[in-house]
Structure formats: structure tokens, C-alpha cells
Amino acid sequence: MSERVILAYSGGLDTSVAISWIGEETGREVVAVAIDLGQGGEDMEVVCQRALDCGAVEAVVVDARDEFAEGYCLPTILNNALYMDRYPLVSAISRPLIVKHLVEAAREHGGGIVAHGCTGKGNDQVRFEVGFASLAPDLEVLAPVRDYAWTREKAIAFAEENAIPINVTKRSPFSIDQNVWGRAVETGFLEHLWNAPTKDVYSYTEDPTVNWNTPDEVIVGFERGMPVSIDGNAVTMLQAIEELNRRAGAQGVGRLDVVEDRLVGIKSREIYEAPGAMVLITAHAELEHVTLERELARFKRHTDQRWAELVYDGLWYSPLKTALESFVAKTQEHVSGEIRLVLHGGHIAVNGRRSAESLYDFNLATYDEGDTFDQSAAKGFVYVHGLSSKLSARRDLQ
């Protein structure tokens, strides 16, 4: 028996075509591995059957929803991770987990080759292959979409010629990637930057005007940075994301229309829906404003950005990311409390904060009766703080 190919299978166009193509061109058997990351949509058994219909000798489903929420979404919250200050890494954080399970499947099913359906223009090829190199450098990597320069038109034509069941047409050629953390849509008419997204682009979120008269107020509770309750009810990490996806999505929260800088050097337009992710990151960042000392908070903003860049760039297993996470774990020791937010009209508004770990001192902050701030100390502080500027200005005026 020839060496098996272990394919990361999504059920979409590129990986469905890849199963048939690998079998025809290489003669190798394909084991399709589909990872359930809470993406919803089609039943995973239907996805498995499609893989078999396309020619896979085996189709495996891995339920990784809780693992994804706790091991990948949670660090994204702890690092307030928004690439280019906007994108909550919807696809980027899923790739290292998919890599992990593909490597495990390769060991279990006797595969010496792993395959993905990424193009040569995207970031995912890097995320997959750097991940494989980090976890299993002995495995060979096959990337038919990239290495044979498939276009979407060619892939659609191949699928039609070989009766491969897909949910894509030349009239509506969206590329969609989704999981419980969010949804990413690209290609088609969206590649023209002036074209506004149409209603059919969105799935996780309602039009922001639909529930205009019924705003939703929600209280998110945290312990050491981790979401643990919603409106006082205990939740798991996965439950927190799912509930906020539903509630924030109903208010049109989490719609992002982004032109981002890809790792490969080009700019790309992406439409993202991440209602739960944006609420949780917003709430967590707000709680840090209340509980972190100023210099620590300032420095963490730099590490948050760097962590997001590392993950976006496919360096999930890098020593720097590991070191940053050790630092961030220390910062979360006092990040416990509750944040109250109003979800309305596509926006998130924080309107309440409370924490037993708060560094906010009412008696120092108030301008009313009860003020304990010693204002007589301010004059000397201002003088010393501005002394270097004063000396520099005096020199420049000479």
C-alpha cells in the first residue's frame, strides 16, 4: 500500500477538489480529517460523507470545540489580540490546532504526508507548514492548490467535471472560513474595495438596525482574566463565546470590513463576523484598565500587539510567543471582576465596572466632599516632572 496522505478537510471547494486530485495524480490514498471548531453550518457527518464521495478512503471528525475555546480563544482574550487593531485572529488561531490534530492523525493512520488546501497568496500556507515543521519535521507537506496554481475557476471546473459536491458557483465565489470564534469571507466581488458587502455576505450577525429598539445589556464576569460568568450565571469558555455570539450577533455587533496586510506582502480585503470575540476582548481590556497598574498596562499593550502579530504570522509555537504568555499569565493575577456592556446597533458600550481587585480609589478620584488627595503635593510633582523639558527649552532659546 502506498503511503497515505492526511488532508486537512474543511468540506469546501479547495479541499474537496484536493481529495480527488491527489488520488488521480499521485495514486495515494487520502485520509480526510475534519476538525469541529464550532463552525456550525453543515452537520459534520455530512462533511465526512462528502469526503468519502470525493474519494477519501477514510474520513475522521475530531470534536475540538472545548479545546479550541480554552486553549486558543482564551489566550486571544488574555492578550486583547486584534491584528492591526481590528482583526481578532478568527482563522489564525484555528490553524495550529488543526495542525496538532493532523499530526496526531498522521501517526495514527500511518501517513507520512500531510496536505492542506491553501493558496500561495494567503497566510494559511505559512501557518500550516511552520506548524508542521515545529511539531513533526519528519512529515512531508503537500499543497496542491498552491504548487499547481489552481484558480477558483479551475477548481470549480474540476469539481463540475468530476461531480464533486460543493456549495460554490462562479456567480457567488465566496471563500468562507468559520469557527465558534468568528467567520471570515473573502474573494468574489469583495475584492473590489469600493463594493459594499451585500446581505448574503453575513451569517453570524443581524443587520444592526433590526433590533434597534431593544438593546441588550450583558454583564461578563472574569477570574484571573478568564470569562467565567454571564449575567451572574457560570459558563465554560465555549458557552461564553456561544452565548455572546448569539446575543451580540442579534445586535449586529462584530461586523468588520478590513483591508489587512498579509504576511506574504500583499493587502487583502476581508469581511469578518466575530460578535462574541469582540465583546469578550472589549470586556477583558476594560477590566484591565481597572485592575492593572499604569506602567504594567502600558507595557502590556505592546506585548498584546506583538502576540497578535506572531499568531497572525504563523508563529504559534515560537519561543517569543511562549515567553510572552508567561508574562501575560503574571499580569492576569488581579484581573477579576465584572464588566457591564450594552450591545446595540452594531456597537459595544461599556457602562459599568466592578472588581475587588480594582486600583480605582473613589476617595482619591472624587472632586466632591470626601476627597483625600493631597493637592499640595501636586506643585512639586509638576515641577520635577517638567524639569527636563524646561532645561531643554532653555538651551534651545539661548
From Swiss-Prot:
GO cellular component, one term: cytoplasm
Primary location group: cytoplasm
Binding site for L-aspartate: T119, N123, D124
Family annotation (InterPro entries): Arginosuc_syn_C, Arginosuc_syn_N, Arginosuc_synth, Arginosuc_synth_CS, Arginosuc_synth_type_1_subfam, AS_cat/multimer_dom_body, Rossmann-like_a/b/a_fold
GO biological process: argininosuccinate metabolic process; L-arginine biosynthetic process; urea cycle
Entry's EC annotation: 6.3.4.5
Subunit structure: Homotetramer.
PANTHER family assigned: ARGININOSUCCINATE SYNTHASE
Protein family according to the UniProt entry: Belongs to the argininosuccinate synthase family. Type 1 subfamily.
HAMAP family: Arg_succ_synth_type1
Protein name: Argininosuccinate synthase
